[in-house]
């Protein structure tokens, strides 16, 4: 039997979340963000489920788009960081990948690299995040260059990204939305601004195309709301099993550094999962896992391959019992808060040795 640490991906949850997105953004096209191996959920598992149900897949780079094509998936892909060299343009157009242009070097490469077919492009404009994107006053010149380039498809899109959408009260959100909506340069056939948080909090930002990421996988983009609050279902269940159980005397120290001990006899379960699998090492006291229909607290330090749980009050738990580290019952948002991070990071840091099932 192989090591029990695994990811269980729920296609029905993925489709439920997509339905929720379409309910929140009726009539809008959907670009499903599947960068970083579909936020750790596995592009092999996710892309075939969404194929034909969305407008396009959003990826970070050419390699991620090619991995989707290798699955036999025909839905278009958009390279959100565009190309990193002029050589990538020919590969992109041959595979019908659209490219985001966000700086002058990319535009120059495109204008100076004749292509056999028209390539679809999106122009990214900086409205306040100050990370990627052309300045607003540069857009007229950019559009002029694209419209005169014979190997650029005329369905040019315009997009921007909100810096603070996960904090809806921040005034920067409406400032960015207003700046974007005020852009009146002709030639842009479709517009996009809304990520997961904006889809939920700023309906006026939905424009023509929305770009859900984290909410597609059943995780909240907000610190003060979880997936259940938003009607989302977690797609990823991070699972393992109990590999050993020990009855310890009073004051027995558990784990590295002996950071946990009980003043009474204790029953300690060992779970086959640790930070080598992507579970966070630094978590707050009494962070739970789910065993036999209840929460059980982690005790002691998380190690590379194992963590330990307090079974003193749970005599029915046995070796081999299934353990949910996060997922349907223990939401990843809760573990992220305990670890002082965000759900995005935890999903994306699952290690390669964890198998998908």
Curated annotation (Swiss-Prot):
It comes from the Bacteria. Its cofactor is pyridoxal 5'-phosphate. It catalyses: L-alanine = D-alanine. The lineage of its organism: Bacteria, Pseudomonadati, Pseudomonadota, Gammaproteobacteria, Legionellales. One of its GO terms (cellular component) is cytosol. The active site is at 35 (proton acceptor), 256 (proton acceptor). It is an enzyme of class 5 (isomerase). This is Alanine racemase. Catalyzes the interconversion of L-alanine and D-alanine. May also act on other amino acids. The modification N6-(pyridoxal phosphate)lysine is found at residue 35.
